[in-house]
Curated annotation (Swiss-Prot):
Gene that encodes it: rpl14
Biological process annotations from GO: translation
Assembly information from the UniProt record: Part of the 50S ribosomal subunit. Forms a cluster with proteins L3 and L24e, part of which may contact the 16S rRNA in 2 intersubunit bridges.
Any GO molecular function: structural constituent of ribosome
Protein name in the entry: Large ribosomal subunit protein uL14
A Pfam family recorded for this sequence: Ribosomal_L14
Protein family (similarity comment): Belongs to the universal ribosomal protein uL14 family.
SUPFAM superfamilies for this protein: Ribosomal protein L14 (SSF50193)
Database matches in InterPro entries: Ribosomal_uL14, Ribosomal_uL14_arc, Ribosomal_uL14_CS, Ribosomal_uL14_sf
Native organism: Pyrobaculum aerophilum (strain ATCC 51768 / DSM 7523 / JCM 9630 / CIP 104966 / NBRC 100827 / IM2)
Length: 144
């Protein structure tokens, strides 16, 4: 019989299925005070695009992505960081049946371990991101 379970994620032991709304080469604004203003997504952590032919990696709320800073402080530009998706415009369905969509896409710059680089987060943060990343929940002023 096959083994059940698999890789564990940080935070909750399971991951909500969120419809991907941010894909490779997307330009996404940053929702914290780390100094970056606009980033480009260059990868999705945990997504293996080489195993499925021509599938473009996509990320939803709560996913960690690899980004490069396009606009912001000069010392941060052209640097590669990790980020967590905290808002997406594409609607996704929660387990209770409600549909959620935000006005914009947004990410928060984090360390590879998942600790935020900034000290505050601007705007609302999705509940799925706070459940998966508790350190982001501590900085969030509004959780939707």
């Amino acid at each position: 019989m096959a083994k059940r379970g698999g890789k564990r994620t940080v935070g909750v032991p399971y991951r909500f299925h969120v419809t991907p709304g941010i894909f490779m080469n997307s330009l996404v604004p940053v929702a914290d005070n780390s100094g970056a203003k606009l980033v480009r997504v260059i990868g999705v952590v945990g997504h293996y695009s080489k195993t499925v032919h021509r599938r473009i990696p996509g990320a939803g709320v709560g996913d960690m992505v690899v980004v490069v800073v396009r606009e912001g402080k000069p010392e941060l530009r052209k640097q590669i960081f990790r980020a967590i998706v905290v808002r997406q415009r594409r609607p996704y369905r929660r387990p209770d049946g409600t549909w959620v969509a935000f006005e914009d896409n947004a990410v928060v710059i984090v360390t590879p371990e998942g600790d935020p680089k900034g000290s505050e987060i601007h705007g609302p943060v999705a509940m799925e991101a706070t459940l998966r990343w508790p350190t982001i929940a501590n900085l969030a002023s509004i959780v939707v």
